[in-house]
C-alpha cells in the first residue's frame, strides 16, 4: 500500500513555485502521483490518496490547533481561496477518474487516514508493506512497525529514525510549533499569543522517558495535564476510535474507477505530456 499525503505533496510545490494556475497545479499534482506510483507500485501495490477533511477533531479538542496557519495565509501574497478551490477540485477529479481510493472524511486529517491505515496492517491477516509519501516527520512514530517505510518528497530521500518510539515521546514533550502545540511546560495559548515557552531541557526529557510508566507520579499536575494534551494531538494511536473505524470502513468499501477513465480524463484536461505515459498511473 502506498499512502500519499495529498495536501502535503500539493502545497509543497505550490508554495515553492508560487503556483496559482489551475492547469499548472493539476499537472503538478498528477505528475507527482504518476511518479510515485511508478516508483513504488510493484513493491507496495495500490496507491491511496489521503486528504485532509474539514473540521478536524483536533480543533474541537484543542481550539489553538494550527491557529497560526490561518493568520500566516492572510499575510501571504498567494490567493489561498483559489488554491484550496483547485486542490479540492483536483482531488474530486482523481476520485472520479484515477484508479486509486481517495479517503477524504469530515473531521479527519490526512495524518489520521495514514495512521489508521498503517495501524490496520498490524491486524491479523492484513499485513502488507506500506510506503508513506510525505515529508511530515509526524509519521516517524509509525516506523515502529517493521512493514512501514517513508519517503520525503522535499528532501528526496527516505525518512529514517533509529528509535521511532523515543522520537514520538520527545515530540510529545517538545510540542509542535507549526501546529500550534506548545511544549508540555507551557500553557495552551503560548504559541497563538506569542508567549515565550518555558525552555525544555534534554535532561528533563530523558528523565521522563526513563520513567515513562510513572509520569503521573513524577510530573507536576500541570505538566501531566499538558503531556496528555500533546499526546492526544500528536500520538496517532490516540485517534478517536469512531474516526479510525470510519477511515477503515471507507477504505474497504470504496470502489475505484476503471483504467479506461484515466486516458479520457487526461485528454479532456489536455495533459498532453502525461498522456504519453498513461500506463504509469495504473496500479501495480
Regions found by a protein language model. Name each.
Residues 254-257:
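Acidic, Ser/Thr-rich, low-complexity intrinsically disordered regions in fungal proteins
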Residues 89, 138, 261:
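Short Gly/charged-rich anion-binding patches and loops
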Residues 32, 36, 57-61, 76, ...:
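A general marker of short, structured functional hotspots
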Residues 35, 39, 64, 150, ...:
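Intrinsically disordered, low-complexity N-terminal regions enriched in serine/proline/glycine
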